[in-house]
Amino acid sequence: GSEMCIRDSSYTVRDKETDVELEVDNQYIMSPKDLKTIHFMNKMLDAGVRVFKIEGRARGPEYVRTVVECYKEAIRSYLDGTFTDEKIAAWDERLKTVFNRGFWDGYYLGQRLGEWTKNYGSAATERKIYVGKGIRYFSNIGVAEFLVEAAELNVGDKILITGPTTGAVFMTLDEVRVNLEPVQTVKKGEHFSMKADKIRPSDKLYNCLLYT
């Protein structure tokens, strides 16, 4: 939602979710949509751009990881001559999982008008549901122990582990054990173990679900 204050020929739009104010003057506005330039990175590199800044303030670690990975792959593809429509489509699908408000191209391709998002809230294709926290890591066998504090998990679920040092780790839950016995589902209040790269106590565990 938004609130509008009329000021002569210009006005200010305030986003209720973020409290961000956008100045609108004649036909020039700033867009609350997420700026995406990956599909014409080749043109930007051809033009001599050599530094790209990824905005990630107030975003989760999964956003930072996914965006940086995609743009890094795009630059490498440009350099080795494999920057293709197929790769762009694949990057777009990955970016859609973490972007919140839809995409626009900014003014890089000559548009005068900005774009307002049509979606209230998030337009990401995936949402993360908090499951629980890390308890300990057994480095000698590569096993992590977690406590389920909220939503249950099932074998086959896509999960996300985040933490200040761990960063963002995506994986599929292939096997899970409770009291050393394999189970299909872990529920609130249960401690469970699974194979994982190193995690830290208090790392957060999420279930990644597709929006329906």
Features from the language model and the residues they span:
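Long hydrophobic segments that form regular secondary structure
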Residues: K36-G60
